[in-house]
Amino acid sequence: MALLDFFLSRKKSTANIAKERLQIIVAERRRSDAEPHYLPQLRKDILEVICKYVQIDPEMVTVQLEQKDGDISILELNVTLPEAEESRP
């Protein structure tokens, strides 16, 4: 039956083939371009502000941007602060 379907099926037009290929390319680029160009500078600026108040290692700050449903972006900022020094009387 599959052999009969193969010979009787219509060939896809070149426009449809090109459209499918373009959709694959666009989907791949969206996955690979997940990080916006401004994110490293944003991380640096946030780190500078935090360092004005607390002495921390730059590796203790993580910034992630997550895309949800195409039009919603979530910026997640995690800062591991050092333990507070006990004040002596």
UniProtKB/Swiss-Prot annotation:
Domain of life, per lineage: Bacteria
Keyword Hydrolase in record: no
Gene Ontology biological-process annotations: cell division; regulation of division septum assembly
InterPro entries on file: MinE, MinE_sf
Keywords carried by this UniProt record: Cell cycle, Cell division
Role played: Prevents the cell division inhibition by proteins MinC and MinD at internal division sites while permitting inhibition at polar sites. This ensures cell division at the proper site by restricting the formation of a division septum at the midpoint of the long axis of the cell.
Family: Belongs to the MinE family.
UniProt protein name: Cell division topological specificity factor
Organism: Enterobacter sp. (strain 638)
